[in-house]
Amino acid sequence: MNSVFFGLKKKLKSTSRQKDGNSHALDGHAFLAANDMPAGKDPSSLNVKNKKTGNKTPLRILILFGKDWDREALQRFGADSDQPYLFFFEGFELFSFPSNTRLLTFNIWRFVHKLERRYAGKIDGVVSNNEQFGSLCASLLAERLTLPGVAAKCILTCQHKYLARQKIAAAIPEAVPQFAIFPYPLIPTDPLPLPMPFFVKPVKATFSVLARAIDNRGALNQLLDFAPWETFLIKRLVRPFNQAMQQLRPDVAANAHYMIAESMLSGVQLNVDGYVRDGQMTLFGLVDEIMYPGTHAFLRFAYPSRWQSQLQQRVEQMTEKILAELNYRHGCFNIEFFYDADTDSLKLTEVNPRMSTQTADFYRLVNGVDAYAINFALATRQPLPPIARSVPKFGVAASFVFRKFDGMTCDHAPTPAQRAWLAQTYPDARLMWYGKTGAGLRREYKWLGSHRYAILNMAGIDAADLRHRVEHVCRYMGWPLDQALVE
């Protein structure tokens, strides 16, 4: 009843024929989902071409910078699945010591070249749902190994907020707000890029890092006043993107050391998930993005959207135009919009050139559509799975984001017993814990304006049932229940 978007397919007109959270990645490890396989093996030693699982030979997929959401989802693709997969993992954990020390010397071209030598002729596809490094690395590697994927130049354009807006504004001016860029550090005497107030964020960033509404010069100066160690970390975070830009887009002067300012938007926020296969677009669904009152911090993602029937056609049409203009030809995507009911305007905020792992389960639970199965089929150029792989269990789903704004951490980390209770009581729920202390906590408050300590994904028969479930979990975990969380 809620699969309004799924199955809407559009042939995108290519504008050019030129080819353009937290993770738990394990270097070189491999496993057959839900089936014991040797870990840490080179793919050539596994002889997977001859390893049968039932009547199917497992397809070999390399996962780059795997995320916590990925690990749980991969267990569905075991020996008894319609199409089993053998997964390999490369990358590192960006937010965990000592794995993140690799950031100090990480070079995107050396990394891709190493993977090319190791996996050439030994995998059937490469996938990453990681926005920071993974999706770009996967694209670069796929091109070198002639595997399906989003073109690398397209990834760069999507992730470079200024380039994306420039390209889209030229063809669809009504889709983007007023925008301008400026370098940082910002010289105090430099003119501001736009009249205040405006919204500012890095040209290349994830998790809404340093994204803030600015209404005076002092607030902007404070936002961009970094300690030496912060400056060092920022340079290391954006260096891989700049390395790719220097080689693939040397014509672009504004690298990731720039900020972008946009005119303020008002209204409700939405995101749409879907995929493109050889230029053919299909949308999974439209999701509401609800913020903590008075902030720009995500509080809840809710599916199906309350605006679905009203905005379905417009979102579909604008998404189609945006993807065509970006020459987005093959792969999953997630696009975010602002809708202002007072002016009836629909504005683009982000184009994410990868699958949204946080919302992917919505479509499986509510519509019976497995976004991961489609993602893997795209990566290996296999026939797409049936639209309904399973019988939907629920009518609604949501992702609840638990935050603190008082400078403190959350003292109620879930215990093993509490996690076991959740798995037994609500087996379809997914809980991710991100509690921080010390320097990591202080950095998160400065860069994000809040501390996101947990995410809880749940589904319900209807809105009332979902509310009952999340309230039950909060009471059991000892977490404060913000009424806005379940309104």
Locate predicted features.
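ATP-binding N-terminal substructure of ATP-dependent carboxylate-amine bond-forming enzymes
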Residues: N2-K13, R17, S23-D27, F31-C154, ...
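A conserved helix-loop-beta module that forms one wall/lid of the active-site cleft
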Residues: E143-A213, R217, Q222, P228-R249
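Acidic, glycine-rich loop-and-beta core segments that form the ion-binding/anion-interacting portion
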Residues: E289-R306, M318
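A short beta-strand motif that forms the metal-chelation/ATP-contact edge
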Residues: A138-L140, D344-R354
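Short, well-ordered beta-strand elements within core beta-sheets of diverse protein domains
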Residues: R212, E262-S263, R452-G460
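Glycine-rich active-site loop/lid that clamps phosphate-bearing ligands
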Residues: R403-T437
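Active-site "cap" helix and flanking loop/linker of ATP-utilizing ligase/carboxylase catalytic domains
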Residues: R314-I335, P353-D411
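Phosphate-binding site of ATP-dependent enzymes
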Residues: L224-M291, R314, F338-K347
